């Protein structure tokens, strides 16, 4: 088995990294060293709420779920109060009414560091690809195989799907914009974190003048509860993600993702995978496989050790609180 994780990485976890950062500047995985890159106290925090059923809200309610079981709006407001020197972005999407958009504006007025960012107002076109190109590339790949190795059933499906692309909808991004399930969340989460600092600067939100378009961001699911300021974070090569552990089996999760710069190459690697497969998944391929590719992870490595290497964990964040309740969908 190849060498996996340098033992020095164990000090990279939230505030622990602060006290040891002068001693431990490097971590290693798969025989390669990576700098623990800082993510400073003014890096914006990003939440996301994509609402599939905006009609479920009463008049005068901000259309972000805020029940006893799922107090997501309260968690966001709590984060804005604690991290009052950071900009707190909320990327939203859904068929909101005029009155609901007014409630978003009222939320911004009441909490000056909260910025509502509408998905439709963000230019993600630099990350797009024609669906027809994705299908054609996969068709040509199948056609290049010897007849005995060709999957004719798959080839027929690909040709049929190519013919059925709706007029004016030949776009990977548009195909996800019309979904109303978890891949809708996951795909645009990846794109938003790719834009990172520029997500805040390009949408013309007031109060974001101190954010560099090239800077990173701290993404948190709305079920993550901040209990105190996060301070400076450190991440290997500038990226770390939440890790779940179930019966000692670990897995990369997208509930928390921190990056120190826009267009992080690990996320770009995941986007390349999304653009190469007709059945790609934004969580498994766009995030998980992209990070693994970037850090040269293979099946020869210890997966739990890789999860330890890339884990974002902080003593001032209570993670994944919705695991104790029923689905908010």
Curated annotation (Swiss-Prot):
Effect of residue 189 to A: Abolished protein-arginine N-acetylglucosaminyltransferase activity
EC number: 2.4.1.-
Protein residues bound to UDP-N-acetyl-alpha-D-glucosamine: 48-50, 72, 219-222, 322, 327-329
Result of altering residue 13 to A: In 4RA; abolished auto-GlcNAcylation and reduced activity toward death domain-containing host target proteins
CC cofactor: Mn(2+)
Effect of residue 277 to A: Abolished protein-arginine N-acetylglucosaminyltransferase activity
Disulfide bonds: none
Consequence when changing residue 219 to A: Abolished protein-arginine N-acetylglucosaminyltransferase activity. Does not affect ability to interact with substrate host protein FADD
Coiled-coil intervals, chain numbering: none
Outcome of mutating residue 151 to A: Strongly decreased protein-arginine N-acetylglucosaminyltransferase activity
Active site positions: 253
Any one annotated GO CC term: extracellular region
Impact reported for residue 293 to A: In 4RA; abolished auto-GlcNAcylation and reduced activity toward death domain-containing host target proteins
Binding site for Mn(2+): 223, 320, 322
Effect caused by changing residue 145 to A: Strongly decreased protein-arginine N-acetylglucosaminyltransferase activity
Glycosylation sites: 13, 53, 159, 293
Pfam families registered for this protein in UniProt: SseK_NleB (PF24688)
Catalytic activity: L-arginyl-[protein] + UDP-N-acetyl-alpha-D-glucosamine = N(omega)-(N-acetyl-beta-D-glucosaminyl)-L-arginyl-[protein] + UDP + H(+)
Substitution effect: residue 53 to A: In 4RA; abolished auto-GlcNAcylation and reduced activity toward death domain-containing host target proteins
Regions that span the bilayer: none
Molecular function in Gene Ontology: manganese ion binding; protein-arginine N-acetylglucosaminyltransferase activity; toxin activity
Role summary: Protein-arginine N-acetylglucosaminyltransferase effector that disrupts TNF signaling in infected cells, including NF-kappa-B signaling, apoptosis and necroptosis. Acts by catalyzing the transfer of a single N-acetylglucosamine (GlcNAc) to a conserved arginine residue in the death domain of host proteins FADD, TRADD, FAS, TNFRSF1A/TNFR1, TNFRSF25/DR3 and RIPK1: arginine GlcNAcylation prevents homotypic/heterotypic death domain interactions and assembly of the oligomeric TNF-alpha receptor complex, thereby disrupting TNF signaling.
Family: Belongs to the glycosyltransferase NleB family.
Comment block on domains: Adopts a GT-A fold and acts as an inverting enzyme that converts the alpha-configuration in the UDP-N-acetyl-alpha-D-glucosamine donor to the beta configuration in the N-linked (GlcNAc) arginine product.
Designated name of the protein: Protein-arginine N-acetylglucosaminyltransferase NleB1
């Amino acid at each position: 088995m190849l060498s996996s994780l340098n033992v020095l990485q164990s000090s990279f976890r939230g505030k622990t990294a602060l006290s040891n950062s002068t001693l431990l500047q490097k971590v290693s995985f798969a025989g390669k060293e990576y700098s623990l890159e800082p993510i400073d106290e003014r890096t914006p925090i990003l939440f996301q709420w994509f609402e599939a059923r905006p009609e479920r809200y009463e008049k005068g309610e901000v259309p972000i779920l805020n029940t006893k079981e799922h107090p997501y709006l309260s968690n966001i407001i709590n984060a804005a109060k604690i991290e009052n020197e950071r900009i707190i972005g909320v990327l939203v999407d859904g068929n909101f009414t005029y009155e609901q958009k007014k409630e978003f504006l009222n939320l911004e007025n009441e909490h000056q560091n909260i910025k509502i960012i509408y998905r439709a107002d963000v230019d993600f076109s630099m990350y797009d690809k024609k669906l027809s190109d994705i299908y054609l590339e996969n068709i040509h790949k199948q056609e290049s195989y010897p007849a005995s190795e060709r999957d004719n059933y798959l080839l027929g499906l690909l040709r049929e799907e190519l013919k059925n692309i709706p007029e004016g909808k030949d776009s990977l991004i548009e195909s996800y914009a019309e979904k109303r399930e978890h891949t809708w969340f996951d795909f645009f989460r990846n794109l938003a974190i790719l834009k990172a600092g520029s997500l805040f600067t390009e949408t013309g939100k007031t109060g974001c003048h101190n954010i560099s378009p090239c800077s990173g961001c701290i993404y948190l699911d709305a079920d993550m509860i901040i209990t105190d300021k996060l301070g400076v974070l450190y991440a290997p090569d500038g990226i770390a993600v939440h890790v779940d552990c179930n019966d000692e089996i670990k897995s990369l999760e997208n509930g928390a993702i921190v990056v120190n710069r826009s267009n992080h190459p690990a996320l770009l690697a995941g986007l390349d995978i999304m653009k190469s497969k007709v059945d790609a998944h934004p969580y498994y391929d766009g995030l998980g496989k992209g990070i693994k590719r970037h850090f040269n992870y293979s099946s020869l490595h210890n997966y739990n050790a890789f999860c330890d290497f890339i884990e974002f964990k902080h003593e001032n964040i209570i993670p994944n609180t919705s695991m104790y309740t029923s689905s908010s969908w």
